[in-house]
Amino acid sequence: TGINLISLEKPGYNPVRSMFLDAAFNICDVDVLDNGININALPNNIKSAVYVNPSNQFPTGVVMPAANRYEILKWADNNDSYIIEDDYNSELRYFGKPLPTIKSLDKKDRVIYLGSFTSTLFAAIKISYMVLPDELSKIFDNNRNNYSQACSKAEQLTLAYYMSQGYYYTAIRKKRALFTKKLKAVTEAFDKYKYEGIELLNTNSGLFVTIKINTSTDEKLYIDSAKKLKIFTDYVEDISNSTQKCIMIYYSYIPLNSIDLIINILFNKWRLL
């Protein structure tokens, strides 16, 4: 393809960064704004690619508006470049109208679309998929025998049947309804028990919320407090600094009827740090 430069969202998903670095790509970090990646900061006059999470940016939860989706397509067309659209968890959007994927708006074959069933089904089924532009599809077909297929055919056929019978969409509706209630419970508990210097960032989609805390205390103490309550958390290094810590709380693992109590206990412990 003649591409050796990849633009990545900052903050972003670090395993993707490692993958591109291992493949010897040069990396261009581009800040994430309130409306998604800063399109004006993308490289111009050079063929490249950009990796984005438009439906639920990791880890900020920012959703790219429709206008920006058209704008990034314009950038790709003007610079003979590609957009890698990782649409993970796009089905798990709880509030507001669903937005069209960048791929569905693409008239110039500039989008590589990635999706996965890991979050919407369960992690044991490692089934993902990729929709390539025609030009790249031909390159892929010529090279695919050099790589092994990690997903079993039995699982793929089972999933195909599951979807053909409408079971998948029924499961998504049920999961979306449950997680909508869980997210609502989290935001209500946050409003009830929050303390000065703590801020909730993303409240529209996904399986986690991101919390920003104004503190110089070691983030490991916050993580350890959550772990003792059996809350799965993670630290967002790219957003954090010496006076501000950013932590993700995966509320999807917390029983609905326990969320209020657990958030209350967690915040009481954090106040003591």
Predicted features and spans:
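Conserved core of the PLP fold type I
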Residues: 1-79, 84, 91-92, 97-105, ...
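Conserved glycine-rich beta-strand-loop-beta hairpin in the small C-terminal domain of fold type I
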Residues: 12, 176-187, 198-212
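Domain-scale detector for complete catalytic domains at protein termini or as standalone homologs
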Residues: 20, 42, 111, 125, ...
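Active-site PLP attachment segment
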Residues: 104-139
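Conserved PLP-binding active-site segment of the aspartate aminotransferase-like
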Residues: 132, 210-215, 232-270
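Active-site C-terminal subdomain of aminotransferase-like
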Residues: 137-155
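Structural signature of PLP-dependent enzymes
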Residues: 141-145, 165-187
